[in-house]
Amino acid sequence: MADNKTDKADQIARLVQVAHLYYDENLSQQEIADKLEVSRSLIAQYLQQARDRGIVRIEVINPMNSCENIALEIQERANLERVFIVPGMHKFQDLTMRAIAGAASKYLEQNVSDSDILGMAWGRTITRLVQLLAPSVPRDIDVVPLMGERGYTGTYSQINQIVLQTAQSFNGRPYFLLTPMFVSSVQLKQDLMNDPEVRPAVERWDKLTTAVIGIGAVPPSPGSIAYVGAKLMRMMQERGAVGDICGRHFDDDGNLIENEMNDRMISISLDQIRKIKRVIAVASGVEKTRAVLAAMKTQLFSVLFIDEMLAESMLNKMRKVEK
C-alpha cells in the first residue's frame, strides 16, 4: 500500500517537474526529453496528463495577479526596491527552490556589469542559482566569497565552489577564501585575514557592488546546526535570535545579536553588507516567515526573491501587526 502511494507521489512530482520546465522555464518538449533522457512523445503524454489532472490550467487572467499584488504590498511595506514571488508548487520544496533560483539567476545575469565586484554567500538556493547561470555575454567582474568554509560537508556549503562556478559563468575572476568560517581564537582570525592568500578576497568586501545572500532561520535545518553547534544555537535562541545572514544572527527587530563567536568568525559584517549598492536576498519555505520579516528590518538588502506560501505568510503577519 505504501509503495503505491510512493509511486503515485513520484508520478505527480514528475508531471509537475515536466510542466514547470515547459511552461515556466520555456524549454521545448525535445529539450525536456533530452534533459530527462526520455522520448519526446513521453513528454507530450506527461504534459497532457498534467492538464487532465488539473496540475496545469490554461486560462486568461488579469496580468496583475495575486502574486504581483502581494509582491507590491510587501515591497511598499518593507521599502524594498523589488520583491519577486515565485507562484505555486507548495508541496514540492525542491521545485520551488529551483524556481526561485531560476528567477534570481536571470535577475543577476541582467544586473551584473563590467567592473562589478560580486559577493556570494552559500546555501541550497544559492547553489542552485549558480548552477542555472547562463549569461549571454561575458562580464569583466571579480567574484568573492562572503565568508569562510563551513565544517559541514554538504555541497551547498562549499563557498569557494560557488565562487568558482559563478566566475566561470560570467568569465570573471574568482577570489577564494581558504579558511574555515569559525576559528579557535581572535588572534588566529586576524592572522588569517592578513595572510597574503586570504587578504585579496577580504579586502574586496569594502568594494562590493553586488551581493547575493540567503536568509537563515532559527532554529535552522538539522544540517545547518552542524556549522554552529547545538550549544551555541541554544544560546542564540535564548538571546532572541530569529535568523541569520552570512552567519550573523539578528533578533525580531533586525538588531545584531552579539556573541563570542562573532569575534572568531571569518565573515563579512552586517555593516559592510549594508554599504553594498545592490544586495539580492533569497529565501524559501513558510518556516522562514519570522526570519525574513526580521531580516527586512536590518535594511541589508533591496531585492528579495521568495515563494508564494512564504510571501502570503509574511503579508498576513505584517497586516496583523498593523492592526
What are these regions (language model features)?
Residues M120, V143-P145, F176, A281:
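Structural beta-sheet core signal
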Residues T125-P138, G223-L232:
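Short Gly/Thr/Asp-enriched flexible loops that form oxyanion-binding sites at enzyme active sites
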Residues N65, R124, R128, E287-R290:
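Short alpha-helical
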Residues V18, I100-L108, L129, A201, ...:
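Generic hydrophobic alpha-helical segments
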Residues D3, K8-A9, Q45-I117, Q131-D140, ...:
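HTH-adjacent hinge/linker in prokaryotic transcriptional regulators
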Residues V86-G88, L146, L177-T179:
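Conserved beta-strand termini and adjacent loop/short-helix elements that scaffold enzyme active sites
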Residues I117-G123:
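Short glycine-rich phosphate-binding loop at a beta-alpha junction
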Residues A2-A19, D24-E31, E37, L42, ...:
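Conserved phosphate- and dinucleotide-binding cores of soluble alpha/beta proteins
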